[in-house]
Amino acid sequence: MEHWDLSTLDVEPHKPQVLHSTRGEARSITLHLPAGEELQDHQVHERAHVVVIAGEIEVEVDGAEVVTGGPGLLAVFDPNERHEVRARSDARLLLVLAPWPGPGHPGARD
């Protein structure tokens, strides 16, 4: 078993840290998003689960639906669903992408 205390990990802004990655299964990543910064409108090939560990974020989906939340918020995006994430305060996030890599992802090619 591998384990991490997500509340105490030293994660630098703009340097996502891959915690665990198993081909064909999932990839777990932590992010530090400073207050006022954002992950601009994007999509990923995998189903994306975003969990707020600390701070507060605002999530916008397809330029329409907006959800705001702090620690404990779980947002799940379908593969290729466009979204953006803004930090309302310094935020620490856990991102789980599954399956890893998803269909169409450049890393899925053998």
Label each residue range with its predicted role.
Residues 46-62:
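Glycine- and acidic-residue-biased ligand/ion/polar-headgroup-sensing regions
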Residues 53-54, 70-71, 89:
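A cytosolic small-molecule/anion-sensing beta-strand core signal
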Residues 35, 45-46, 65, 81, ...:
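A generic "binding-loop/recognition-motif" signal
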Residues 13, 27-44:
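Conserved short histidine dyad/triad with adjacent acidic residue
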Residues 63-80:
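Short acidic-glycine-tyrosine-enriched beta hairpin
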Residues 39-41, 59-60, 77, 82-88:
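Short beta-strand His + acidic residue motifs that chelate non-heme Fe in jelly-roll/DSBH
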Residues 1-27, 70-71, 75, 107-110:
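A short, N-terminal "cap"/entry segment at the start of jelly-roll beta-barrel domains
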Residues 79-103:
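Ligand-binding loop in jelly-roll beta-barrel domains
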